[in-house]
Amino acid sequence: MQVEVCIQSQINQSSKDKLTNLNLYPAGIYPQTWKNWFKTWLEYLQPHIPPAPSYELGVLLTSDEEIQFLNANYRFQNKPTDVLAFATLEVKYPKSEDMLNSMPLSIGDIIISVETAQRQAQKQEHLLLTELAWLATHGLLHLLGWDHHDEYTLQIMFHQQVALLNKVGITIDFDPL
């Protein structure tokens, strides 16, 4: 399975000043690491996703200010959030067999606020790397159609996130309530 991941960082200077040791790769997570994580996660989830020879997705690491703008415009909630996911698998468009076999299947974009991730990591007493991976798994599951309409489905999703993190060697203390 091939996986293409486009990582972008869009953090303004005032936000950079709020974050400690922030560079283009927060928590030292380089593009190849993101790609390896998503490849591992998609392989693990493959029985539950549309078959394709390759997949592609985007990850935008941004500020509270930018994610609040997106949250207000797309979810009508004028406040920052930790992660947003914009799925392309929900979009219906004609696909020929040749197209499916020759082009990567775009599953969507994940937007993560590094500022919120840093606060949540401190609150949960784990590394920023762990929090960013946690949020990435949450966004990925949303891209693949998972949702949490109530506490029960949220807990199922959280347990799946723990399993995904374990697949890439990240452990997290998870307290379901």
Model segments located where?
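An acidic/histidine-cluster motif and surrounding catalytic segment
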Residues: M1-A133, L144-L177
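Conserved ATP-binding N-box helix of the HATPase_c
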Residues: L141
